[in-house]
């Protein structure tokens, strides 16, 4: 049933032609007034389109619910306001007349009362659809059609709304086929015919009108001649929406289609997801310099619309489909002109003719014609004078005496000026794959392009950019394989009778002709639909010009009007075929096999766009721009530098791994329960000879699914005896194949480029949140963060800043990003160094001959030892020479215990133990050139300013320290002397725990007996040690950890205003704790207060601490932002500082002294 918002005006001379219609109107008047679900407060008589910035152009709503695949739709709700449209008059008139006779016959046969609820009926053909009109009374729509009888009463009451308008001034309108009995020469076929026929839509936009306002006086004069001009326009800037309830399922799900628009010449949007439902609006003649459209269609919670906006004003909108529909609809826009692609329509012929020479005309009429191929022509041809008589004729919805609306079977639209040639979309394989009911046939979505030429005012510029966002694939079994064949040469179009026969027969494969390209693809699951549904979010000018929009949309397109500053860096990223004198055609999110013959010339010669067939093949990666950046090492621009992303930017991005040994290592790492970090190295190669899917995932790590996919489809095209094949590996979150095939006829080349990507994979299974599995707590530019966006069923959003905020970063933010980049590189170097040392020591005894050590200089001395810098076997080492003080037996026991604990502490966040000598007693460890954390933060022997770390590095250093302590506790070792003096840094700023002289092995009972002597420095001493309670546990390290983190955060010494003994006493007996600054993240503040609780049992274990720090890092992708933090962190202060005196650098810290 077709529904239109046009209100029939009683008493109008346009509604009194047919007695049948009068009877329908009288029956409608007898019907009781229904309650509407939404009230529209528009003044339909005097409203004008007065806003120049936000004009919502949905003038008429025409919905055909019977053709929807979603059955049981029982209610329609409209929000917004009606605009009158002469174009819509003819459209709605066609819908009414097409089913007029059949509706009246059905109405006479049906009883007066119908049940309140109708059972869902099977999908009906367009011949059985009913037309109806929506009541409009004082700005209100009544939408609740409770039974079929009521719908038919409304339908018949508005059938003859415009019949008399079809009988005048149509002598010069040449139509070859006049098949309608009710003078339908000027009518557009009903929407129900669109889904089952090959339609050629010729839309001629009224771009020459300068004013959006209409003269209400003339509209009042024309009220009796055109009842639909009563509502000329509306200034209320609210969108239309269509909602319906699905009764086919056990639970009702509300679905909404909304149109937001501020462009002037959008005429129609046909949504495939609700099949034949259409939103039709009239040109308001207002031109926007930067049009922005946002069309959102939500049939399921995970469905949405995709919006692509380019810097030169071009954009495209894709409606994501749901599981009950086959493919979405796409809207293309070029230079303020719109081209409509409906996936239900196999053939669409769109022509735009700007022939309106009368710029002062109030509201020109859209003249329509119908031929045997269902060519719908809307011509704005007005060459008449500006007198009122001509204005009345223009509003009668008739053909003007211009002889410009000539329609024939050859799909010709002959205008007097022929400003713009046709942009024809031709289905070359309609003989075999012309079945609209076949959800597995992707060819109904991707249409070949022939002659995409735009010629205005004899300048013959080419259309520089045709953008088609990714459609969603149909839901089929994953094991199904569909092979489809498309030809690269055009074939004659079948007749309407043959097309109807093709639609009724099932899908069958056809043998490919000699000049075909065959692709065989494998379908994927419905999760790929959800990947496409990610919304890009912002439609501001900042987003249009932003870096995010550039590489997410993959703007690697050579265009005259394109002012993309990253154009040079994009040229090598997206492969597109270019020939001399030929502009580049590219596609953002769809894999295109572009073939340019050497005989191709600029002008009207044919360009063939062969969209790859296959139901789910090559269509589900919405971030081809990222893939291109990562796969080309020669690019001068990196998409992963100095930029901030959040989940909505990277919803389907991941890193492709092509090394099978690396995949095995990751799988093993994910299944281990140790607390160490693993550094993963990925090499993405562009060229591969074969494809294969290797997907690694762990059941306990939903967010760490790493898909190793290297699927390559090779497409070759023979032209001038030269074949060129260039393939690109894909980045995907599932087993979807994405390839970009570049066929260049003049040269033969194969590109191989690689780029290494290093990221961290955490193998800790005790994550408190699904999203907190990434161990790199402060990096937003490493692949470890991008790994979080792998799974399409992610329901939570990070608490990070938005795109707009992230792009406007202060120098502090940029320096923080550089620090994180430096930290990632240092992680890579540290891992390599760690593995080298480990391999050397793995086959040797730990007993080292003192004669093999080369002492260089003394770097420190304490009461119990002195530390030297030296070399051993080419390794830079630190030598700790112990002093024998007191009983020799106690000295030997302490020496052996420290050596044993160092041997057990084989972790990258614990200083590397190399060996030991007994005479003299020496412990050899790796040399830490950065010195102790205490010297870096406080610089007691230097006049240089103290280092103040940015918040991301604070989180990273805290996480590294927590990981080292977690490893110690896992092997039952308690450090007992954790201070900033015993935290060392290497030359790259990586943190490692040292000095195990006071460490103890925890007993089986879980507690240790208090011993005499000072354990831990008094300023960092836990309260239970000060109180001498007799027993303590590993929670003493948790307390010390919290004070060291506070020290890193503030750069201050704990309790600096008190003596060490006074500080420990007030901590134990008065509950004294250091103040946490206001610029600290609230979650980190809560964690610190938990860690320094007086009761050790209330302190969390390090398993919880590590996961909490990762969660804080996830919620702060670029760090916690605060004005106080900016004031605290000075831009000129270096983020990473080494000790200015090498003599103070040591891998073995001195024995703690009382401060």
From Swiss-Prot:
EC number(s) stated in the UniProt entry for this protein: 2.7.10.2
Alphabetized PROSITE patterns for the sequence: PROTEIN_KINASE_ATP (PS00107), PROTEIN_KINASE_DOM (PS50011), PROTEIN_KINASE_TYR (PS00109)
Residue span(s) of domain Protein kinase: 853-1126
Annotated Low complexity bias: 10-21, 41-53, 79-123, 142-214, 225-237, 364-381, 393-419, 483-525, 575-599, 1138-1155
A single GO molecular function term of this UniProt record: protein kinase activity
InterPro entries: Kinase-like_dom_sf, Prot_kinase_dom, Protein_kinase_ATP_BS, Ser-Thr/Tyr_kinase_cat_dom, Ser/Thr_Kinases-Pseudokinases, Tyr_kinase_AS
Region (Disordered): 1-54, 77-253, 352-423, 453-529, 571-599, 710-753, 1134-1155
Statement: the UniProt record of this protein carries the keyword Lipoprotein: yes
Comp. bias regions, Acidic residues: 382-392
Binding site for ATP: 859-867, 880
Biased composition (Basic residues): 215-224
Compositional bias per record (Polar residues), positions renumbered to this chain: 243-253, 453-465
Any single biological process term in GO: signal transduction
Lipidation (N-myristoyl glycine): 2
Family the entry assigns: Belongs to the protein kinase superfamily. TKL Tyr protein kinase family.
UniProt-recorded name of the protein: Dual specificity protein kinase splB
